[in-house]
């Protein structure tokens, strides 16, 4: 366990300090100093006892040593070794009992000191072993701390490298996304270019096909001829003329002339139909522009005046470009594409505008909606059934047109033409035609889907327009009641209707109705102007006449309800009905209010049924 260490007891140290203090006060011999050192030392006393006493006390200094011991013991608190003498002059005698007691006490103290020393030494050994253990633990912990620091530094470096790698990967991902976007744009542009090239090639192919057909039909091949089997004779029983070159040439010429006449007749019909369709489409486009321009100014003036003017100017520019271009000189495909694109664009604008109006109407109706404003379910179901019937009719018409076109395309050709065409057609062209046919089917499906969505939007538009017309009629009624004298107007209108019932001449009806029309226009300046604009802007088709009937019916119903005139007074003459050719106007009134409502609803449904066929 190493060398023994000298550890001093604190009690002994304090006693030694006291001894040194007392000895410093008295004069001490060298032998006494040596004895003090022996007491303070840590060497065991049993080894040096004889030597110490041999040196300390001799036969010559017994008295001195006894006096010294007495003095020292008295300083430590022990009783004196001498007996107390009554007289100062008498000699003091040594007290053996006191000496023995002092020796016993000194021995007890020595034993206690030895036990304390042993306990201190064992404690010191324990503390030394604990210190060694703690030092070893400290060294181990220090090594662990160093290793953990190294690991932490390595992890920090790895984290830094991973962060740098992550940044580089993010940058690469961003670059890849940009590259993908560029490639997608390039692919889209190339796809559009490819579609244009395909259309151009199709046109060229059709032209070449027509040219080939003309060349084949005009060219005569003598080697190949067509024989007639199961020849049927004439009805009169006469024999036919002999076959000669002249008769065959004349018959072939007549056949070709008949075929050419048929082709020209069909071509004229198709051109006339195309011209009518072009007129209808252009008129529809103009009227849609006229419908959209006043309606879009109001909501867009509130939000952004600039955007509304730009959109309307774009529509007007498109219409101006179509009108400026020589539409009749262009081919059918280009005109059709231009018209369909422009109409689709205007239809989207109209759809967005209607959706905005729908949102505004839903907000207004959510605040205060009455049960009278809601359309009944039966009316809605009836309208849907009528629209479905009209859709089926349109489908049947489309199928009939397709059959006619197929019949026109599938004209009977000669054996010469069939053989040449079979030789000319290649496998690649057949595959390309199959691919185009699949694309056509997909486009047809998409067109049907869009058509359904457009029909639904048209139904919603019709319902909203009906609600709007009812609100407008109520508003006109209120304005009329607020701005005119009710009693005076009743008297004038009663006179007017009595004049209507008395006269059978339509001119008389028109003359009597003119001042009333002027009064109506002077009373409500805003709403009739809007209705006139709407009626003017609609296309000149059966739907426009029906729509005009609805407007006139609504205005008539509002005027009848304002003036409180009975249905008998409002009946016009039969001559006036015949002269107007079933066109309602301000002069001719329905037989009753219920008839007016039924006429409005039927005309409104027929108008929207025609609107559903839009692309």
Swiss-Prot record:
One GO CC term on file: protein-containing complex
Subcellular location: Cell junction, Adherens junction; Nucleus; Cytoplasm, Cytoskeleton, Microtubule organizing center, Centrosome, Centriolar satellite; Cytoplasm, Cytoskeleton, Cilium basal body
Molecular-function GO terms, alphabetical: protein domain specific binding
Ligase found in the keyword field: no
GO biological process: cell adhesion; centrosome cycle; cilium assembly; intraciliary transport involved in cilium assembly; regulation of cell motility; regulation of Rac protein signal transduction
InterPro entries: Adhesion_Centrosome_assoc, Afadin/alpha-actinin-bd
Composition-biased stretches (Basic and acidic residues): 568-581
Keyword annotations of the record: Cell adhesion, Cell junction, Cell projection, Cilium biogenesis/degradation, Coiled coil, Cytoplasm, Cytoskeleton, Nucleus, Phosphoprotein
Family stated for the protein in its record: Belongs to the ADIP family.
Function per UniProt: Belongs to an adhesion system, which plays a role in the organization of homotypic, interneuronal and heterotypic cell-cell adherens junctions (AJs). May connect the nectin-afadin and E-cadherin-catenin system through alpha-actinin and may be involved in organization of the actin cytoskeleton at AJs through afadin and alpha-actinin. Acts as a centrosome maturation factor, probably by maintaining the integrity of the pericentriolar material and proper microtubule nucleation at mitotic spindle poles.
Self-association state and partner proteins as the record states: Interacts with SSX2 and SSX3. Does not interact with SSX1 and SSX4. Interacts with afadin and alpha-actinin. Interacts with VAV2. Interacts with PCM1. Interacts with WRAP73.
Protein name (record): Afadin- and alpha-actinin-binding protein
Organism: Mus musculus (Mouse)
Underlying gene: Ssx2ip
């Amino acid at each position: 366990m190493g060398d023994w260490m000298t550890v001093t007891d604190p009690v002994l140290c304090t006693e030694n300090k006291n001894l040194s203090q007392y000895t410093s006060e008295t004069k001490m011999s060298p032998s006494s100093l040596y004895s003090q050192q022996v007491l303070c030392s840590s060497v065991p006393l049993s080894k040096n006892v004889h030597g110490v006493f041999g040196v300390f006390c001799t036969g010559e200094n017994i008295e001195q040593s006894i006096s010294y011991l007495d003095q020292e013991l008295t300083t430590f608190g022990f009783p004196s070794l001498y007996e107390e003498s009554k007289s100062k002059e008498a000699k003091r005698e040594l007290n053996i009992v006191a000496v023995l007691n002092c020796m016993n006490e000194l021995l007890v103290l020595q034993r206690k000191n030895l036990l304390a020393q042993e306990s201190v030494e064992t404690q010191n050994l324990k503390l030394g072993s604990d210190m060694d253990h703690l030092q070893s633990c400290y060294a181990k912990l220090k090594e662990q701390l160093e290793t953990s620091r190294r690991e932490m530094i390595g992890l920090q470096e790895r984290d830094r490298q991973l962060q740098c790698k992550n940044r580089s990967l993010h940058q690469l991902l961003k670059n890849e996304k940009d590259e993908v976007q560029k490639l997608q744009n390039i692919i889209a542009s190339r796809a559009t270019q490819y579609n244009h090239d395909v259309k151009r090639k199709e046109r060229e192919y059709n032209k070449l096909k027509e040219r080939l057909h003309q060349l084949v039909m005009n060219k005569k091949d003598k080697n190949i001829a067509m024989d007639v089997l199961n020849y049927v004779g004439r009805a009169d029983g006469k024999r036919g003329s002999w076959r000669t070159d002249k008769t065959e040439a004349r018959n072939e010429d007549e056949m070709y002339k008949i075929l050419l006449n048929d082709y020209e007749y069909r071509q004229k019909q198709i051109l006339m139909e195309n011209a009518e369709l072009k007129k209808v489409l252009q008129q529809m486009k103009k009227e849609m522009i006229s419908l959209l321009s006043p309606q879009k100014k109001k909501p867009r003036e509130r939000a952004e005046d600039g955007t509304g003017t730009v959109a309307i100017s774009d529509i007007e520019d498109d219409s101006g470009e179509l009108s400026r271009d020589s539409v009749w000189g262009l081919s059918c495909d280009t005109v059709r594409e231009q018209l369909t694109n422009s109409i689709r664009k205007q239809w989207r604008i109209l759809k967005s505008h209607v959706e905005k109006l729908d949102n505004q109407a839903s907000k207004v109706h959510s605040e205060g909606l009455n049960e009278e404003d809601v359309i009944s379910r039966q009316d809605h179901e009836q309208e849907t059934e009528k629209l479905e019937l009209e859709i089926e009719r349109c489908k049947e018409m489309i199928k009939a047109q397709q059959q006619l076109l197929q019949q026109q395309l599938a004209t009977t050709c000669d054996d010469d033409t069939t053989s040449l065409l079979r030789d000319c057609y290649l496998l690649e062209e057949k595959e390309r035609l199959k691919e185009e046919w699949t694309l056509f089917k997909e486009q047809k499906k998409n067109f049907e889907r869009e058509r359904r969505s457009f029909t639904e939007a048209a139904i919603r538009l019709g319902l909203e327009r009906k609600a709007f017309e009812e609100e407008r009629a109520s508003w006109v009624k209120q304005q009329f009641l607020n701005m005119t004298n009710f009693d005076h107007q009743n008297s004038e209108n009663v006179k007017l209707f009595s004049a209507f019932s008395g006269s059978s001449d339509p001119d008389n009806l028109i003359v009597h109705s003119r001042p009333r029309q002027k009064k109506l226009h002077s009373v409500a300046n805003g709403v009739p102007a809007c209705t006139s604009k709407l009626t003017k802007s609609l296309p000149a088709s059966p739907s426009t006449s029906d729509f005009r009937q609805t407007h006139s019916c609504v205005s008539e119903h509002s005027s009848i309800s304002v003036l409180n005139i009975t249905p008998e007074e409002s009946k016009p003459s039969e001559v006036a009905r015949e002269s107007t050719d079933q066109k309602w106007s301000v002069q001719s009134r329905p037989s009753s209010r219920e008839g007016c409502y039924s006429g409005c609803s039927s005309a409104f449904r027929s108008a929207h049924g025609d609107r559903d066929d839009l692309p």
